[in-house]
Design a protein with these regions (language model features):
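C-terminal regulatory/interaction module of P-loop NTP-utilizing enzymes
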Residues: 1-100, 105-241
Length: 241
């Protein structure tokens, strides 16, 4: 089997490909671009996210979305004669160094997905403003692999980067025998945000040349729940380049 080094442009080995995705996952977390990791149940999606949080020295708040009901994203009450939505405790525990991990997100019913749009897109839970530097990561199974699974609605799917997680048999066997090494995340250097304007110039130059790629709405249910180009997703790219 060919082992590709870090300079290889076209990796054909499963291990190298998984390392690339792992780095993209960590990059999304550090640039505060929401990211969702897709894969079958039981392959270690949660453990990978926990390892990245440890490596980046971030506090991790985990929520299992399959157990959510609408009150978990804002409990409606009357306070001082006004209607308000109270945020749950986990939302109050978030700070600028928090990684919020939403597990089993594809098991979230459409009604709750609609409420979660504010968490993912606006950093808001109920009437509580979440920290603007809060990082959000999710995991999901395909609808046919999840108990009570749902496809993501197009507006939700467009608010995140989608990564497919795979299982490499050789790596699993090695880990079972010799132990699984903790995954290290490469940290961004200081000043990365100052480079965003130059990246925007690069992206807009591409769109001027190929304007048909600025927006391509999904045409069927199968594609609406995954990544698709929009002004929002191009803005994400400017943070990730």
């Amino acid at each position: 089997m060919c082992r590709c080094n870090r300079y290889t442009r076209w990796p054909i080995d499963g291990l190298v490909l998984s390392e690339v995705k792992r780095n993209v996952n960590a990059l999304c977390i550090q640039t505060r671009v929401p990211v969702i990791l897709w894969g079958p149940p039981g392959i270690g999606k949660t453990m990978r996210t926990q390892a990245i949080a440890r490596s980046l020295k971030m506090s991790l708040i985990e929520q299992v979305c399959s157990t959510w009901d609408p009150t978990d994203v804002g409990l409606p009450v009357i306070s001082n004669g006004q209607f308000v939505r109270l945020a749950p405790k986990w939302a109050h525990d978030c700070d600028d160094n928090t990684l919020l991990y939403l597990d089993e997100f594809s098991c979230t019913p459409p009604a709750i997905q609609a409420s979660a749009l504010k968490i993912v897109g606006e950093r808001k839970c109920g009437d509580l403003a979440l920290p603007l530097r809060l990082s959000i990561a999710m995991s999901a199974n395909r609808a046919d692999q999840a108990a009570g699974g749902w496809d993501l609605a197009a507006p939700m799917a467009n608010r995140m980067v989608h990564l497919d997680s795979s299982l490499v048999t050789e790596d699993w066997c090695d880990g079972m025998i010799g132990g699984f090494p903790d995954q290290k995340a490469e940290k961004l250097g200081k000043g990365w945000e100052a480079l965003i304007p130059a990246k925007r110039a690069l992206v807009t130059s591409f769109i001027r040349r190929f304007p048909q790629h600025l927006l391509a709405l999904p045409e069927d249910e199968e594609t609406q729940g995954r990544t698709w180009p929009s002004p929002r997703s191009w803005d994400f790219l400017c943070r990730l380049l």
